[in-house]
């Protein structure tokens, strides 16, 4: 909705869902990311497909893509793909980025080792990663302070959407932090 305008109709879409716009079929497919429920878009035209996976991270360990992801991308095997619009962070670096499981393990090791205050910087959109940090901190009886409007808003939305449920007193306001 745009401020000051009438309500604009919208469509709620799911992974594997489709909508039609004129002669173009718009299809959605799931992608792996630290943002829950991330999806790519396929524009199916009479000439072939135009694809954008959006923001994604291959779910892989040691360069081997997961079976779930292999299955998800198999929809492209027999398709006539005209254009794939994608980008890659750190493309100039050889190899793969760390698998999310290893990122989680690294964070767990750091959180476990630090006895005092710890500051973790993260993208506010990395909900899965942030939820993991909160859950692990809970197992150790540690408190979490969120700072930044986007960080607070995204976590509130994730909690309201049922993506994770922190214990009542795990996330505290910054004013409750002792010097």
Task: Name each model-derived stretch.
Residues 1-178:
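His/Asp/Glu-rich metal-coordinating catalytic cores
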């Amino acid at each position: 909705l745009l401020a000051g305008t009438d309500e604009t109709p919208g469509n709620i879409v799911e992974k594997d869902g489709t909508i039609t716009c004129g002669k173009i079929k718009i299809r959605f497919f799931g992608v792996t990311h630290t943002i829950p429920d991330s999806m790519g878009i396929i524009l199916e035209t009479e000439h072939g497909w135009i694809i954008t996976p959006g923001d994604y991270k291959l779910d892989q360990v040691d360069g081997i893509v997961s079976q779930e992801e292999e299955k998800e991308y198999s929809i492209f095997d027999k398709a006539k793909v005209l254009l794939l619009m994608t980008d890659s962070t750190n493309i100039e670096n050889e190899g793969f980025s760390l698998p999310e499981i290893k990122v989680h393990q690294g964070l767990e090791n750091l959180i476990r080792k630090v006895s005092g205050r710890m500051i973790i910087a993260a993208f506010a959109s990395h909900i899965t990663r942030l939820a993991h940090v909160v859950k692990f901190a809970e197992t150790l009886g540690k408190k979490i302070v969120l700072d930044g409007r986007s960080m607070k808003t995204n976590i509130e939305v994730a909690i309201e959407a049922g993506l994770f449920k922190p214990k009542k007193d795990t996330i505290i306001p910054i004013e409750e932090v002792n010097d």
